[in-house]
A protein has these predicted regions:
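Bacterial Sec-dependent N-terminal signal peptides
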Residues: 1-32
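Long, intrinsically disordered, low-complexity segments
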Residues: 22-25, 44, 63, 67, ...
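An aromatic- and glycine-enriched ligand-binding surface/loop that stacks and positions planar moieties
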Residues: 24-90, 197-198, 214-365, 507-512
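Conserved, well-structured interaction surfaces
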Residues: 39, 44-52, 56-62, 87-165, ...
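Flexible, polar/acidic helix-loop-strand segments at domain edges
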Residues: 90, 94-101, 329-407
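Structural register within alpha-helical repeat arrays
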Residues: 147, 154, 224, 231, ...
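Short coil/turn linking the two alpha-helices of tandem helical-hairpin repeats
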Residues: 160-164, 169, 230-236, 422
Length: 528
């Protein structure tokens, strides 16, 4: 995305905002500086530059090295980062520990989700403090709306923290330097819900323009729906009807205004220039030129084999790591377009159409579904991530915007809540999402309420070169619905959360992962 990138680069508050420091490089922590007393936002554009400084940590916590996407995906049943012959990816066995649920408080993946997300909380608190003290001179309705947006944004960072760590400290006072006390998970849940509900009606209803990549009213309702969707796990009390109510608010607005809708092709949500997608409710804007952190959105770098540099004419050579768990790939219907659209597979070619060959032995580079184990794999074992478009000639960073909240999720959240309440209508909503994936076989898009309540088609059980088990998934309550979530939302940094909600994250085995214990439903709070 390029047309709106100024929302992020200018969000750093460069010379106009920083007292003694000015920098346009997003590698800098310039959003951590105190805003100059001379700065007075006068226009809607000025306000957008101010508030967007607080959104930058979302990108970092989600997608930078060992960020939240990995913390949600590499521990779950869809993706694995195995050791690669001739390439590496052993890295002190951090990815093996992720896969096998044996992580420690010292692991980088445990630490980064904590530090980067609290950086987002602290940035919100800093700007709120400056507004409340008059350092940033904002008056009247503009001040009220700005404070509301920052509080909802802060709540979104706590949405990550409650999911990953549970009973975390609630920090709202930027100037309080005392050691914060942990809150219970329910207290954190109630805080997040309160912050969203008390402030969302003050947010803009505008989905684009200066509000693209920011929380508007509809994004807040969607975030609140996700809180209610996970309420039973996070607070101890299910709130399915409240989830439905929040989804209905967004659905009714979408149908009335036409601002939000499913794309005709799922792939269109994830193309390089996806900033105009009506399916995206809340996006994290990216641009390979202006977003300059080395590991900002580098899916192509850590999934493609090094030889694929010649396929996409990349400016840097990929590292050939993450791939799909074979059991997950085998769960797809062969006519489901999402299997081909979301995974790079089969014979690989150069940009000019010649057969791409393996550097190690000159044989054709062919991505196969099978992977021997977490401990050993060849350069072309496993299907590769390909949901996001890899544009020709890109650098080590993608320019696709990240669809953090999208309309398909609203439909699926409502469907799941209806199903769990024993109400009708889930099948029709899921069918609506499936139809674009089965255009050539429309009858296969149809799914009923009863089918969604059945078991999973995923054949669980340890399945690698060390052991072969076939435990299946027919015993999973609402397992078919869980399958639907996996097929629609793969590679989007949410699988762990879904598996926990359906009660199988620690009770099932897959690939090189054995069953673990319920303590692994949360990451430990880091020691550092």
């Amino acid at each position: 995305m390029k047309t709106n990138i100024k929302l992020w680069t200018m969000g750093l508050m460069t010379a106009a905002l920083l007292g003694n420091t000015a920098c346009t490089d997003l590698l800098h922590d310039s959003y951590g500086q105190v805003v100059s007393e001379d700065y007075v936002p006068k226009t809607e554009e000025d306000v957008s530059y101010l508030v967007n400084a607080a959104y930058i940590p979302w990108r970092e916590t989600l997608l930078q090295w060992n960020g939240v996407v990995r913390a949600q995906e590499l521990c779950a049943d869809q993706d694995v980062l195995p050791a690669r012959d001739g390439i590496g990816w052993v890295d002190g066995y951090i990815y093996k520990r992720w896969h096998q649920h044996t992580w420690t408080t010292e692991d980088d993946g445990v630490l980064q989700g904590w530090e980067r997300t609290y950086n987002g909380v602290n940035t919100c608190n800093r700007i709120l403090s400056q507004i409340e003290e008059g350092v940033i001179s904002v008056d009247g309705e503009t001040k009220e709306k700005l404070i509301a947006e920052l509080k909802v944004l802060r709540a979104s960072y706590y949405y990550i923290l409650i999911d990953l760590y549970g009973n975390v400290p609630i920090v709202t006072d930027f100037k309080d330097t005392s050691l914060p006390q942990q809150s219970t998970r329910k207290e954190v849940f109630d805080f997040i819900v309160k912050e969203i509900t008390e402030n969302m009606d003050l947010l803009s209803e505008t989905p684009r323009g200066y509000y693209y990549g920011r929380f508007n009213k509809w994004a807040a309702h969607t975030l609140l729906a996700k809180m209610y969707l996970n309420a039973e796990v996070w607070s101890g009390t299910a709130q399915w009807q409240k989830c439905i109510d929040e989804c209905d608010i967004v659905i009714n607005y979408a149908e009335k205004s036409g601002e939000y809708a499913l794309e005709n092709n799922q792939k269109d949500v994830f193309v390089t220039h996806n900033e105009n997608s009506k399916e995206i409710i809340f996006a994290l804007p990216f641009d390979e030129i202006y977003v300059t952190g080395w590991n900002d959105f580098d899916f192509h770098m850590y999934t493609l084999a090094p030889e694929n540099q010649d396929t996409y004419q990349l400016t840097a050579r990929p590292w050939g790591g993450v791939c799909a768990v074979p059991q997950f790939i085998n769960s797809f219907d062969e006519d489901d377009a999402r299997l081909e659209d979301n995974y790079i597979q089969g014979q690989q070619y150069t940009y000019s159409g010649e057969i791409l060959k393996r550097s190690i032995d000159g044989k054709p580079l062919i991505y196969t579904v099978d992977v021997p184990s977490i401990d050993q794999s060849d350069v072309d074992d496993g299907f590769r991530w390909g949901k996001f478009e890899y544009a020709t000639g890109i650098t080590n960073r993608l320019s696709n915007d990240w669809p953090l909240l999208r309309y398909a999720d609203v439909l699926m959240m409502k469907a799941e809540s209806l199903m769990r309440l024993g109400k009708s209508g889930a099948g029709a909503l899921v069918t609506q999402v499936r139809e674009r994936a089965f255009k050539n076989e429309p009858e296969k898009a149809q799914v009923t309420d009863a089918e969604l309540m059945g078991g999973s088609v995923y054949d669980y059980g340890r399945r690698d070169s060390y052991k072969t088990e076939h435990d299946g998934g027919t015993d999973i309550k609402y397992g078919r619905f869980l399958d639907e979530l996996s097929w629609e939302f793969c590679q989007e940094g949410r699988r762990r959360q879904d598996m926990i909600r359906f009660g199988i994250f620690t009770t099932k085995a897959w690939f090189s992962h054995d069953k673990s214990d319920e303590t692994k439903n949360l990451y430990p709070i880091p020691n550092k």
